[in-house]
Structures are given as structure tokens and as C-alpha cells.
């Protein structure tokens, strides 16, 4: 399982390259860089977003989703402020719960590390959503 708390994006890129069996020459041509520069990127814990976007396109994998999962699991609880102005930034409604996140949460319940209510409160997952996961993936019985 991925470590969503401590993200080392260079290592994840390296793993994805190994999975896809992509040639280093192709990567160097895509980035217009040397093999040493590619190896240096593997060692980076963080990369600039424009570089990460290129990696996502080249490897056909959404590396940004890893950071989204981190926000779901570890961001502080949102404070309700009715006086706050609406953001000019787009508001996304796309389903951001990947199978890895669902498995991570269900595993915490299955091992009694957390109760269903604790999961709902800590990760702000709607109760109906959690119970649908439990039913759909039938790893644990809904009570």
C-alpha cells in the first residue's frame, strides 16, 4: 500500500517506470535531459508541478491524486465560516476516493484500529458512503 502520509514522489515515479518498463532513452528525449538528471529526479521527495504534470502524461498515471489522498486522510477538519466569501477557484465534485483509500479505511475498521464512527469523524466520509463501501467490498459486516 502507498504511504499517503509521507510522500516521496521521486520514488513513486521510479516504481511506475519499472512497472511500465519504459526505456530511459525515451524519458530523456521526453524531458530533453540527461540520464543523470532523470536519476536525480528519482531522488527528489518533491518535484515542481510542471515536471510532475509531464511525468503524469508520460507514464499515464495521475501523480497528483496521491496528494489528494493525503489531503483526504490528513488535512485538518474544515472550519465552518458562514462569512467566508465564495472562492473564485473551481470547486471539484469528482469522486476522489480511489480503491487504495477505500481499502486503507476498510482495513482500519476490519482490524479494529478505528470504529466506523471514528472513520466518519476523522476522515469526514459520509456515513452512507462508508456503509456502501462496506456492503460493496464486503470485507466487514455492517452493523
Model-derived features: positions:
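Short alpha-helical "recognition helix" segments of helix-turn-helix
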Residues: 23-28, 117-123
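Recognition helix of helix-turn-helix/homeodomain-like DNA-binding domains
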Residues: 31-47, 136
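DNA major-groove recognition helix of helix-turn-helix/homeodomain DNA-binding modules
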Residues: 50-66
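Residue-level signal for the short linker/turn that defines the boundary of a DNA-recognition helix
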Residues: 22, 50, 113-114
Amino acid at each position: 500500500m502507498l504511504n499517503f502520509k509521507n510522500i516521496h514522489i521521486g520514488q513513486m515515479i521510479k516504481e511506475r517506470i519499472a512497472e511500465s518498463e519504459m526505456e530511459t532513452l525515451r524519458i530523456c528525449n521526453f524531458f530533453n535531459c540527461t540520464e543523470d538528471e532523470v536519476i536525480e529526479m528519482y531522488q527528489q521527495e518533491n518535484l515542481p508541478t510542471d515536471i510532475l504534470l509531464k511525468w503524469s502524461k508520460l507514464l499515464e498515471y495521475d501523480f497528483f491524486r496521491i496528494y489528494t489522498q493525503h489531503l483526504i486522510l490528513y488535512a485538518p477538519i474544515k472550519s465552518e465560516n458562514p462569512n467566508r466569501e465564495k472562492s473564485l477557484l473551481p470547486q471539484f465534485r469528482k469522486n476522489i476516493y480511489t480503491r487504495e483509500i477505500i481499502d486503507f479505511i476498510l482495513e482500519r475498521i476490519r482490524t479494529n484500529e478505528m470504529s466506523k464512527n471514528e472513520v466518519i469523524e476523522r476522515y469526514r466520509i459520509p456515513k452512507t458512503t462508508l456503509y456502501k463501501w462496506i456492503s460493496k467490498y464486503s470485507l466487514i459486516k455492517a452493523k
